[in-house]
Swiss-Prot record:
Pathway(s): Porphyrin-containing compound metabolism; protoporphyrin-IX biosynthesis; 5-aminolevulinate from L-glutamyl-tRNA(Glu): step 2/2
Species annotation: Burkholderia orbicola (strain MC0-3)
HAMAP family: HemL_aminotrans_3 (MF_00375)
Reaction it catalyzes: (S)-4-amino-5-oxopentanoate = 5-aminolevulinate
Keywords assigned: Cytoplasm, Isomerase, Porphyrin biosynthesis, Pyridoxal phosphate
Statement: the UniProt record of this protein carries the keyword Nuclease: no
Gene: hemL
Name used for this protein in its record: Glutamate-1-semialdehyde 2,1-aminomutase
GO terms under biological process: protoporphyrinogen IX biosynthetic process
Quaternary state and interactors: Homodimer.
Documented EC number(s): 5.4.3.8
One GO CC annotation: cytoplasm
Keyword S-adenosyl-L-methionine: no
Length: 427
């Protein structure tokens, strides 16, 4: 029995499912999760000492690679000063200034500890600002595990949303309307039917939790216009795509300014940190200035802020995103070429340092299209690549991530492994 298997059996005795976040359990793909012992650059090593090329990177934060020496040094420099204070620090101001500089639509920002906290707080703020209750979200977009966001579409536009998790009361779910991603007609119909009830529309401008699906410019511009027309707050959930698809996030990529933005992952540099921010007039409704309450013992934690601030400084290096985007595109295009050569139906896409792999004839544009991919074939591919020492997301419904340490040699090794994996799939 491998050390991974021993640890997984042991973990299941004291941790539900043996993991602290469901996707880690390998339920979608089968098999035994890899327990990470250490990581460096584009690699990690599991409990059995096997090395893997890592295309998850902690689900996005590790944009400069694992244990970057400057990030490590920044963390080490603050450790001796104290782990947590529950009081303001100068470093909190510095990271807030950096975020506001890089994302111009954010005039003020509040630090939190997780993406779920960021989206949950942004929605409460939008409701407090507008005095309205209804939230609009989109099928396939994931915004954390707050009750009002674990909702799927009803049978028609005017029906109440339905909970997607046990423990979410129907009375909460009914305030959330779920529409099809990238469907402008459905969006216009919804605003026409109850536009004056909508407090906020929350959207991943580049979705990463139904695999990678890009928002179309037409869809995102329609969102911006309709929210402005009806007085609803437009919330861009950039927890995943913020500082991933471009230096200024998806807003810089598309040239669209949100009213509120949720950030996470990259801004913590691998530490637990997230944030939400936006227009000053909206943020002024937060306590202690306004009546919308939000708080957190570990918000602005000095160690997390040190890692995040250094990461934000590193990604501003000239040419950083050009090189990262080119490497990610080389990976996606190369995988598609290897599949084509083997005669395996497959498509791939990339934007910035995010990529998606689809066992389908073309790149999907909605959750419904994603679900038509061949999941069984993806699962086989996943395990073939895992055996080769390449670690992709253990689910057909997750995006992948490239770091600045994924150099040509790493991409070449990945494509060589994929050539063998696709050949096995085609056999």
């Amino acid at each position: 029995m491998s050390n991974n298997q021993i640890l997984f059996e042991r973990a299941q005795k004291t941790i539900p499912g043996g993991v602290n976040s469901p996707v880690r359990a390998f339920r979608s793909v089968g098999g035994t999760p890899r327990f990470v012992a250490r990581a460096q650059g584009p690699y990690f090593w599991d409990a059995d000492g096997k090395q893997y090329i890592d295309y998850i990177g902690s689900w996005g934060p590790m944009i400069v690679g694992h244990v970057h020496p400057e990030v490590l040094s920044a963390v080490q420099n603050v450790l001796a000063d104290g782990f947590s204070f529950g009081a303001p620090t100068e470093a909190e101001i510095e990271i807030a200034e950096e975020i506001c500089k890089l994302v111009p639509s954010i005039e003020q920002v509040r630090m939190v500890s997780s993406g779920t906290e960021a989206t949950m707080s942004a929605l409460r703020l939008a409701r407090g600002f507008t005095g309205r209750s209804r939230i609009v979200k989109f099928e396939g977009c994931y915004h954390g595990h707050a009750d009002s966001l674990l909702v799927k579409a009803g049978s028609g536009l005017l029906t109440f949303g339905n909970p997607t998790s046990a423990g979410v009361p129907a009375d909460i779910a009914k305030h959330t309307t779920v529409l099809e991603y990238n469907n402008v007609a459905a969006l216009e119909e919804a605003f026409g039917a109850f536009g004056d009830e909508i407090a906020a529309v929350i959207v991943e401008p580049v979705a990463g939790n139904m695999n990678l699906v890009r928002g179309t410019p037409e869809f995102l511009n329609a969102l911006r216009a309709l929210c402005m027309k009806h007085g609803a707050v437009l919330i861009f959930d950039e927890v995943m795509c913020g500082f991933r698809v471009a230096l200024g996030g998806a807003q810089a990529y598309y040239g669209i300014a949100a009213d509120l933005t949720c950030l996470g992952k990259v801004i913590g540099g691998g530490m637990p940190a997230a944030a939400f921010g936006g227009r000053r007039d909206i943020m002024a409704h937060l306590a202690p200035l306004g009546g919308v309450y939000q708080a957190g013992t570990l918000s602005g934690n000095p160690i997390a802020v040190a890692a995040g601030l250094k990461t934000l400084q590193l990604i501003q290096a000239p040419g950083f995103y050009d090189a990262l985007t080119a490497q990610t595109k080389r990976l996606a295009d190369g995988l598609a070429a290897e599949a084509r050569a083997a005669g395996v139906p497959f498509a791939a896409d990339s934007i910035g340092a995010m990529f998606g792999l689809y066992f389908a004839e073309r790149v999907p544009g909605s959750f419904a299209e994603v679900t038509k991919s061949d999941v069984e074939r993806f699962n086989r591919f996943f395990h073939l690549m895992l055996d080769e020492g390449v670690y992709f997301a253990p689910s057909a419904y997750e995006a992948g991530f490239v770091s600045s340490t994924h150099d040509d040699a790493v991409i070449d090794a990945t494509l060589a492994a994929a050539r063998r994996a696709f050949a096995a799939l085609a056999a």
